[in-house]
Amino acid sequence: MTSANKSDKDRVVIFDTTLRDGEQCPGATMTFEEKLEVAEMLDDMGIDIIEAGFPIASVGDFEAVAEIAKNAKNAVIAGLARAIPGDIARAGEAVRHARRGRIHTFVSTSPIHLAHQMRKSEAEVLEIITATVTQARNLVEDVEWSAMDATRTPIDYLCKCVETAIAAGATTVNLPDTVGYAVPDEYRRMFRTIRERVPNADKAIFSVHCHDDLGLAVANSLAGVEGGARQVESTINGIGERAGNAALEEVVMAIKTRGDVMPYWCNVESTMLTRASKLVSAATSFPVQYNKAIVGRNAFAHESGIHQDGMLKNAQTYEIMTPESVGVKQTSLVMGKHSGRHAFQHKLEELGYKLAENQLQDAFVRFKALADRKKDIYDEDIVALVDEEMAASHDRIKLTSLTVIAGTHGPQRATMKLTVDGQTRIEEAEGNGPVDAVFNCIKRLVPHEAKLDLYQVHAVTHGTDAQAEVSVRLSQDGRAMTSKAADPDTLVASAKAYLGALNKIVMKHQRDVPSAAAAS
C-alpha cells in the first residue's frame, strides 16, 4: 500500500509487551540494563506503545518503567496495574516523566474468574471498573482498560463492562484471549458485536491481546483487527506466559505482506525485526527456534533441490518476502584475523549494534582473540560475541581463567580463577565429568543455593572450530534465570553461561531487597 493510499482508520497501532508479559515467561527475566536496551530498540523501530513493566511488582520493575519513561523518544510508555488503587497510583508515578504515558489497568470479567479468583459479583466488578478507570484517568490522559478472560465472558455482560470502562474515561479497550481459547471467527465476531452494541464504542480504540495456547495467537490477532480492533498487543519472538503471546514480527509482516486482502498498515520498521529478535533472545537467553517464522535461522533457507532451482530462477517462486525486508543479510562469511577495527565497527553497524567507544574497543579485542582461534568468522559469531560482552558488562562475578583435566579414567578436575566484586579467587574441584567439575568449582568459589534446571549446548555456526553456545537456567527462591555464552571451548562457554545466570540472580536479589523492606 502506498503512502498516498494509507488511511488513519486502517492504521494498526502496535503495542509491545515484551518487557511485561514477555518477561513473565519462566526464566526470561531481564536485568535493568537489558530492559533499557530492549526498550531503546523498540522505540527506534517505531513501536507505538511499549508496556515497560508492572511497577507495583518490585522496586526493580518500578525503576525500569520510570527510566524507560524518561528516555523514550517517540513511543507511549505504559505501566500495568491491577484494579487496585495502590497499583494505579504506583503506575502513574512510574510513567509521569514520559512524553506520553499510559496506565493499563485490568480486571477479570469471566464467570470462572469472578467466582474463583475475584470472589465478586458482576455488579461489584462494574463498580470497580468505574472507580479504577476514573482514578487512572485523573493521573494520565491515556488509559487502557482490559477485560481479563474476555473470550470466556458472556457477551451481554462484556458489553456492560466495556460501556462502563469507556464512560469512566478509558481511551483504549483491550479484549484479551487470556488463555488462548478462542478461534479466529469467534474472536472476529466478538469485536464486531461489541462495537455494534456498545453505544459509546466510538469513543475508544479496541485492542487485541492473544495467547498462543492453541497456536492461534497471530491468526486471532489479525481476526480481531478484521473485527474492528486497531491495536495489536504482542511480543518479540512471541515470548510470554505459558505458550507465549502473538509474535510481533509475525503480526507486522502479515500486515505488510498481505495488503492485498488486509487493507491495514503500521509504523514498524520491519528491517529491524531480526536484530530485535536477536537482542531479546540474548537478553532473555531464550533461543529462537530454527524454523521460527520471519526471524528463525531457517526462515529463508532452501534445501530442497526443487526449491533451490526455483530460487535461482526467480526468488519469488518460494519467498513471499525478501530477507532484506526483515533485516537479514545475504552474506554470512564476513571477517577474519586480518580485519581492522574500522571494518569491525562497520560490520557491527550492519548487524544493528551501536556501541560506546569503550564497549567497541573491548568487543574488538575479543574479536581478534576469537579470530586467532577460529579460521572463519561468521555474523553469528560476532552477534554471540557482542551480546555476551554487553550482558557481562555489569557482572559482579567474572571468569578470569579455567583449566580442566579430563580423560577416560579417574575423576575430572577443574581449576578456576574468578573475579568477584574486584577480588580474585582461585579454587579447584572434581566432578563426574568435566562440566560437573567446572560447575562444582563455581559453587566452591561462590557458594549459593541455586539449582541447575537446564544445560544445553549447540554450535553457533558449522565446522569443527565452531563456537559452542551454551544455555544455562538456574532457579533459586522461586526465580528462574537463564543465560547464554559462546566460546570455541565448550567448557569455557559452560562456565560463562553458568556465571551469567548466577549474576542475574545476584542482581535481581539486590534490586528486590528494597521492595521487601518497604513492604514489611
From Swiss-Prot:
MF annotations from Gene Ontology: 2-isopropylmalate synthase activity; acetyl-CoA C-acetyltransferase activity; manganese ion binding
Top-level lineage group: Bacteria
Residue ranges occupied by any Pyruvate carboxyltransferase domain in the UniProt entry: 12-274
Location within or outside the cell: Cytoplasm
Entry-linked SUPFAM superfamilies: 2-isopropylmalate synthase LeuA, allosteric (dimerisation) domain (SSF110921), Aldolase (SSF51569)
Pathway assigned to this chain's UniProt record: Amino-acid biosynthesis; L-leucine biosynthesis; L-leucine from 3-methyl-2-oxobutanoate: step 1/4
GO CC term, one of those recorded: cytosol
Keyword Cytoplasm: yes
UniProt entry keywords in alphabetical sequence: Amino-acid biosynthesis, Branched-chain amino acid biosynthesis, Cytoplasm, Leucine biosynthesis, Manganese, Metal-binding, Transferase
GO BP field: L-leucine biosynthetic process
A Pfam short name: HMGL-like
EC number(s) from the headed UniProt entry: 2.3.3.13
Subunit structure: Homodimer.
Family according to the record: Belongs to the alpha-IPM synthase/homocitrate synthase family. LeuA type 1 subfamily.
UniProt name for this protein: 2-isopropylmalate synthase
Biological source species: Nitrobacter hamburgensis (strain DSM 10229 / NCIMB 13809 / X14)
Encoding gene, per UniProt annotation: leuA
